Amino acid sequence: MGKATGFLEYGRKENPFRDAGERLHDYADLHTAQGTEERHCQAGRCMSCGVPFCQSSFGCPLHNLIPEWNDLLWRGEEREALERLLETAPFPEFTGRVCPAL
């Protein structure tokens, strides 16, 4: 899944906060979105664990298949990644806000 050495090559990148003055005037997202290239690099950080923590009983409470999703993003198959995500998370715009991994 992803790039075998991706976690060594790409640092974890958080989505930056939008300026507070800008946020006062709308109800848009608190963070700025990552671009396509940045999403690609972050998806490449998935380490292809033997037993992925994100798939354990302590991992994703929705049982999302995160390694598969990251691999699709890494390969540039964004539409397929979305379809895979929607199989287990019908409302990712809500559940993604409370994800314990973020």
Labelled PLM ranges:
Residues 1-102:
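Ferredoxin-type iron-sulfur electron-transfer modules and their immediate structural context
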